[in-house]
Design a protein with these regions (language model features):
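Sterically constrained small-residue positions within well-ordered secondary structures
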Residues: 11, 39, 135-137
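N-proximal, solvent-exposed amphipathic alpha-helical segments enriched in charged/polar residues
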Residues: 20-43, 55-57, 116-117
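Generic detector of short, well-ordered, non-transmembrane alpha-helical segments enriched
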Residues: 16, 44-45
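Transmembrane beta-barrel domains of bacterial outer-membrane proteins
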Residues: 45-91, 123-197
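Flexible, glycine-rich linker and terminal segments associated
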Residues: 22, 88-90, 96-127
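Sec-dependent N-terminal signal peptides
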Residues: 4-15
């Protein structure tokens, strides 16, 4: 009887450890303010989908996510699916051996970036995530963004015809998969056209 109880306890501990890695990945992405997070582990690969809307520039957000995810101990192969308006745009694969080398100090983060696989073919990652519930959905969230606009118009090579600097505040919201709403106004700051503003 004791043997059955101990085998069952070891089995349950093993199952909880298997479930711990996807939870760690999900929590790490949540702490980094990523949106539309989906994480699943299948066949020694953790597939995670997310949107990097909180960071200036999508690639900056991807780099920050990779830096934090490869630091998670005992992480298997990572397959990252980058989303834009809830549509998959990029699939990044980081092999477990590369993560282990980085954690052991045998390679730098730059080498991880150089050796990771990157493709726009996202079908396999999307199939892995089919049926997985999304966390931190961006649906209905309103973002306030300010875009600077610099305009230089030259119709002839020897004279600057028009120059202007504008601020363009916008309210953006994701509606459904692949669709977003942007309401934007243009506020002129400086212009070389007399009487225009």
């Amino acid at each position: 009887m004791k043997r059955i109880v101990s085998v069952t306890a070891v089995f349950l501990c093993g199952i909880s450890l298997l479930q711990a890695q996807p939870v760690r990945v999900s929590e790490t992405l949540k702490e980094l303010d990523m949106e539309n997070i989906s994480v699943v582990e299948k066949r020694d690969t953790i597939t995670a989908a997310f949107k990097t809307s909180a960071y200036r520039g999508i690639y900056n957000g991807i780099g920050i996510a990779i830096r934090h995810l490869v630091a998670i101990p005992e992480i298997p192969t990572l397959q990252l699916l980058i989303l834009d308006n809830a549509l998959p745009q990029l699939c990044i694969t980081i092999p477990a051996e590369l993560v282990q080398k980085y954690q052991a100090g045998e390679c730098e983060l730059d080498e991880v970036y150089r050796k990771m696989g990157m493709t726009t073919s996202t079908e396999t990652a999307v199939r892995q995530l089919k049926g997985v519930k999304r966390k931190e959905s961006s649906f209905g969230k309103v973002d306030l963004v300010v875009y600077p606009n610099v305009m230089l118009v030259n119709n002839v090579t020897y004279k600057l015809y028009k120059a202007a600097l504008e601020l363009q505040p916008a309210v953006e919201m994701q509606l459904w998969k692949g669709a977003s709403l942007r309401m934007q106004v243009s506020l002129p700051i400086v212009s070389n056209e007399d009487g225009k503003w």
